[in-house]
């Protein structure tokens, strides 16, 4: 308990050797808060936190705040550095233990050729460059040590690469899954191991005083390494098995024994004359990597190390840094020269190794810029050099400045050179709507599913099941295109070391991941070909990675499946069905996650589809009304008598009815809301693939401006089959595609109207011509099961859909074999669909609709959001045309 108290008028921050805790707490709060504040602006530049911690230490030191009178005397007095250094060095030992666990020797073995080549080049050449510049830097020392020892230390500092910082930069730039990232990661591990060996050798030679003593120290260090790897490593594995730490979470006893080993190893390496951090590093390398054991251990200690211990260490380092000692032109000349030599030697050597590996110049430059990263490990080396007396304050400050600059420029340099790498999806685009019409019939032959969450996999399996049912029940004489299922699994990683460890073991993880294996088994049981990719991505900005993966797989369409939450939908009645809150409830977590993926949807150069589903069980379907007409009072009725009278003109609709008054229930009902946009064509193509099954039926609701002022009519008063739309009386289709005339037969119009009298009623607008063309390509069997319904406003559309889909029956049903899937296109501000939205928006607001300000709401548009909220329990497919599509008709 503290003997100082504010009630006694004591200065509680005065250092007391018997009770140093109060001042230590004040120091820790100031250091951590300042480092976090500095990191906020640097994070927007994608800079690692270590730069903020180094700068924070420099700011607290004599360079900046040390110039405030009495600041260092009261807050960081020399006498208080003992406890601060003790805690920070303990944290450093634990941090090196974590770094040791990052070193997966299996990666070195699998990529030994690449690792050996890049590691040797990236160490030998910078080592030689450091030896050259050390001749000039030696003049700034007191020359208490031999030049050879000084040369060895400077060369080690020049040749080392900060592997922990490097791994985080690779994660931020989404390079971990690429060949460039694999090469740099492997070389970084090799560089890290050799760098620590060189550092141990340097410290040994400095502390030995004689060559014979140095040999003894090295032999003891080698013996300790062999003892750990030969005797202790198998025992650690057996202990992990015995305590069930491999199968489950690491037990408390296992963690206690491992941390005790870290301290013992650090103690031994310190007393033999190397450094305690080397002992912690060695213990980290012997921890088994099976079943993510290193990840689980790291998760237990990394937050304490990264949030408390490391900032204290770098702050104590910054307190020793005095940039004001760089006060002459000659010193600044050597400082700039040191920075240039450090970057040029590291970058040039790594680039040369990459060129030997036959990598392109652009990728070679990326490898070189990444390997020039210094940062955290450099600071450790410099502090050891300062504590041993090899470096004085001037050279120490010079190299700290060099470490900050080289680490700071790593990310911008890498991003700059990445611009010159060939974009693998630049050519993956469709340039015009005419090209899309030709492209669509073959579109869904290779379906790519983006799976970010386990629930997404369930939704993808439901979509695949829909396709399988159609293929499985189709007539044997009908030729179907081969369908390949391609899944893209994303593994999100952040700056946490445990996540980076998990990412580095992704290949092993993919092979053993139960969900991925289950998904693959499901696809193969359905007799589809299967391909998959696992991507290591950070939380944001990974869209280019996905797009490049799509290009490599030659995908025709990207489908993003989402599983909606039934529990939230049950509570929907508490709010307006058109309110934004109801829409959020209908989509569940998909609403938020879709907002994060909007840039991917907008940037895609191939069609994109968003599939919403609730659960694998199908829904009840009300008895289908093949003809829905409107009476003069606006109420709907089934006009089977009129159907019989007009049987001659509506013989294609007759297939939907077995006999007068009967109901013929289809096993699958698919609905398309067609507003004449390119996005709707994407939805149309997927709808047609759902019609291979002979017992399925489709309703295509088309918007026609002719009815936009007909608000008195609650239901559409015109229903046509596709054959009517493709009749020769459709002047626009006849003029644009004369060949269609051969496949079209004359149809007499209903209700006694002559052709001339009724032609203005059923001629679709220009936006429907692509629909006509696509429907003319399908088989007679499919076309006969398509009914086209016109509507003039959103109210009439909703009324018709409510008649088709009975709201009271929208509950989970395990007995029916029926399902409903609705297909829509995203909003298109340049299309006629925008007019429908504008006309309906004011009316929707009166009914309680709150215009969505979300990214997804703006992209999807009013119509899909309203339909999603009105029919939350049916499946939805929302289509989006490629980015470079030329809009217009």
From Swiss-Prot:
Species the sequence originates in: Schizosaccharomyces pombe (strain 972 / ATCC 24843) (Fission yeast)
Membrane topology reported for the UniProt record: Multi-pass membrane protein
Subcellular location: Membrane
Alphabetized GO MF terms: potassium:proton antiporter activity
Keywords of this entry: Antiport, Ion transport, Membrane, Potassium, Potassium transport, Transmembrane, Transmembrane helix, Transport
Source superkingdom: Eukaryota
Gene3D superfamilies reported for this sequence: 1.20.1530.20
Membrane side Cytoplasmic: residue ranges: 33-39, 102-115, 168-179, 236-253, 298-322, 386-388, 879-889
Protein name, entry field: K(+)/H(+) antiporter 1
Recorded family membership: Belongs to the monovalent cation:proton antiporter 2 (CPA2) transporter (TC 2.A.37) family.
PANTHER family noted in UniProt: CATION/H + ANTIPORTER, K(+)_H(+) ANTIPORTER 1
GO biological process: intracellular potassium ion homeostasis
């Amino acid at each position: 308990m503290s003997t100082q108290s504010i009630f006694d008028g004591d200065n509680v921050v005065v250092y007391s050797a018997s009770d140093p805790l109060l001042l230590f707490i004040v120091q820790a709060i100031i250091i951590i808060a300042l480092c976090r504040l500095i990191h906020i602006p640097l994070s927007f530049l994608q800079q690692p936190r270590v730069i903020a911690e180094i700068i924070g230490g420099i700011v607290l030191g004599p360079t900046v705040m040390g110039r405030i009178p009495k600041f260092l005397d009261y807050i960081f007095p020399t006498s208080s550095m003992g406890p601060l250094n003790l805690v920070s060095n303990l944290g450093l030992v634990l941090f090196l233990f974590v770094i040791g666990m990052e070193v997966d020797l299996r990666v070195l073995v699998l990529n030994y050729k690449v690792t050996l080549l890049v590691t040797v080049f990236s160490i030998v050449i910078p080592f030689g460059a450091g030896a050259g510049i050390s001749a000039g830097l030696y003049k700034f020392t007191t020359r208490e040590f031999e030049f050879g020892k000084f040369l060895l230390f400077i060369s080690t500092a020049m040749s080392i690469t900060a592997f922990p910082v490097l791994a985080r930069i690779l994660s931020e730039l989404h390079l971990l899954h690429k060949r460039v990232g694999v090469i740099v990661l492997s070389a970084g591990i090799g560089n890290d191991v050799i760098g620590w060996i060189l550092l141990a050798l340097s410290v040994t030679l400095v502390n030995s005083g004689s060559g014979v003593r140095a040999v003894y120290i090295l032999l003891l260090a080698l013996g300790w390494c062999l003892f750990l790897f030969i005797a202790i490593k198998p025992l650690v594995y057996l202990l992990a098995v015995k305590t069930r730490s491999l199968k489950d979470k690491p037990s408390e006893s296992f963690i206690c024994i491992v941390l005790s080993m870290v301290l013992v190893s650090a103690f031994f390496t310190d007393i033999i004359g190397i450094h305690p951090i080397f002992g912690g590093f060695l213990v980290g390398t012997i921890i088994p990597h099976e079943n993510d054991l290193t990840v689980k251990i790291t998760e237990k200690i990394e937050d304490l190390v990264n949030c408390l211990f490391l900032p204290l260490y770098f702050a104590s380092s910054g307190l020793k840094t005095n940039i004001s000692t760089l006060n002459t032109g000659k010193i600044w000349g050597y400082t700039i020269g040191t920075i240039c030599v450090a970057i040029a030697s590291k970058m040039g050597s790594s680039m040369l190794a990459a060129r030997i590996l036959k990598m392109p110049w652009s990728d070679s430059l990326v490898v070189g810029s990444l390997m020039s990263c210094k940062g955290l490990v450099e600071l450790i080396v410099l502090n050891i050099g300062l504590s041993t007396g090899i470096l004085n304050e001037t050279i120490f400050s010079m190299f700290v400045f060099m470490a900050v600059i080289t680490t700071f420029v790593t990310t911008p340099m890498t991003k700059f050179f990445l611009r010159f790498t060939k974009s693998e999806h630049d050519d993956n685009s469709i340039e015009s709507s005419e090209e899309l019409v030709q492209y669509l019939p073959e579109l869904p032959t290779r379906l790519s599913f983006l799976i970010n969450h386990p629930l997404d996999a369930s939704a993808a399996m439901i979509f695949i099941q829909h396709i399988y049912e159609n293929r499985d029940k189709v007539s044997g004489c009908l030729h179907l295109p081969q369908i390949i299922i391609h899944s893209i699994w994303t593994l999100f990683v952040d700056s946490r070391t445990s996540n980076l460890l998990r990412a580095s073991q992704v290949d092993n993880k993919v092979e053993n991941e139960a969900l991925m294996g289950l998904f693959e088994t499901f696809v193969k049981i359905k007799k589809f070909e299967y391909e998959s990719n696992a991507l290591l991505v950070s939380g944001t900005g990974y869209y280019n990675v996905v797009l490049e993966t799509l290009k490599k797989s030659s995908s025709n369409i990207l489908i993003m499946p989402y599983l909606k939450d039934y529990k939230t939908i049950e509570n929907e009645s508490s709010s307006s069905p058109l309110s934004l809150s109801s829409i959020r409830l209908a989509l569940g977590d998909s609403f938020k996650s879709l907002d994060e993926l909007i840039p991917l949807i907008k940037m895609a150069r191939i069609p994109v589809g968003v599939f919403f589903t609730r659960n694998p069980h199908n829904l009840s379907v009300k008895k289908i009304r093949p003809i829905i007409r409107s009476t003069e009072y606006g109420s709907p009725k089934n006009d089977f008598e009129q159907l019989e009278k007009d049987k001659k003109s509506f013989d294609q609709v007759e297939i939907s009815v077995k006999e007068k008054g009967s109901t013929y229930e289809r096993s699958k009902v698919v609905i398309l809301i067609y507003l004449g946009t390119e996005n709707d064509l994407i939805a149309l193509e997927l709808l047609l693939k759902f019609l291979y099954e002979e017992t399925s039926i489709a309703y295509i609701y088309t918007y026609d401006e002719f009815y936009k002022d007909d608000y008195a009519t609650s239901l559409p008063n015109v229903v046509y089959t596709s054959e009517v739309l493709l009749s020769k009386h459709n002047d626009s289709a006849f003029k644009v595609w004369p060949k269609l005339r051969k496949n079209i037969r004359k149809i007499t119009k209903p209700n006694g109207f002559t052709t001339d009298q009724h032609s203005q009623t059923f001629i679709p607008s220009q936006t429907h011509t692509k629909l006509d063309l696509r429907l003319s390509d399908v088989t007679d069997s499919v076309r006969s099961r398509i009914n086209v319904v016109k509507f003039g406003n959103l109210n009439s559309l909703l009324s018709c859909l409510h008649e088709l889909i009975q709201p009271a029956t929208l509950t989970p049903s395990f007995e029916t074999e029926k399902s409903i899937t609705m297909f829509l296109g995203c909003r298109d501000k340049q299309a006629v669909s925008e007019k429908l939205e504008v006309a309906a928006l004011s009316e929707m607001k009166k009914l309680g609709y709150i215009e969505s300000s979300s990214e997804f709401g703006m992209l999807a548009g009013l119509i899909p959001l309203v339909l999603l909220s009105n029919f939350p329990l049916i499946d939805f497919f929302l289509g989006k045309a490629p980015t470079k599509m030329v809009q217009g008709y």
